[in-house]
Amino acid sequence: MVDLAKTLAAKGKLVYQGKPISAEDSLKSGIAPYIPSSELVNAVNLAIFLEKRPLLLKGEPGCGKTRLAEAVAYELGLPLVTWYIKSTSRARDGLYTYDAVKRLHDAQLVRIGKESQANVDNLDEYINKGALGEAFENKQRTVVLIDEIDKADIDFPNDLLRELDEQKFTIDETGKPIEAKHPPIVFITSNDEKDLPDAFLRRCLFHYVKFPENQLANIVKAHFSQSSETLIKAAVNKFMELRKQMEKGKAGKKASTSELLDWFAVLQQFPEDEILQELESKIPFPEILLKKWEDHLRYLKYEA
């Protein structure tokens, strides 16, 4: 594969290399270790270089889509703003919101002499910037995460097209134009709850975050550096044994990387020999990995 990071770095461009975060740095910063594939590193650098193209990330829930933005911001030393999408979210919310209720309340205070008319007339006081609005106004390049865009109304992605493409917008209430001082690095995640419009997809870069089967032991080790290789290997093997059974059984929800990490966090609390013995015959603490009763019946051996 062409090494885009190396090529861009040689030209003095900003690049993401996917450097591992040490356990010590993780504890200090609160940033979880993240081990990206080389393909994902390339996709991130495309988004950084092309500037006006957000990177759309798809993949199984729990595969690390959301954590990527955090890891990129940490490595590059850039601020991160996050916009968690809900079914009620509107595209304008990511730019700004206008607090009409507060202004009405303040107008009532003017009548009784507890607020000045000048303050109420200053509409800027009632404007709150959203994630994109904040990123546009930041004095340095900013990483923006738009999380789970597929939760919103079908028109939501298209309503963002102009602002993402032109890197500017106008506050309707004041007529004030806002233009990006530095183009943000935008990551958008989707769990495929609904299809996204073609017009929106054409303006995005796309990467599917694959389940990191070959990296699982390294991922666990990065999070639990004090644990032994023996325990990590045994836990990962048991986890993959379960996951392959779920794939064969066509389970709608397969155990994910994030659940593996939760599971291992519990396993390591016990004496190693005790857990190793348990792992030989069964799945300890299945509640962490199996989220439906049918899965418990299908993948666990219950005694009569």
Language-model region placement:
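C-terminal regulatory/interaction module of P-loop NTP-utilizing enzymes
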Residues: M1-A304
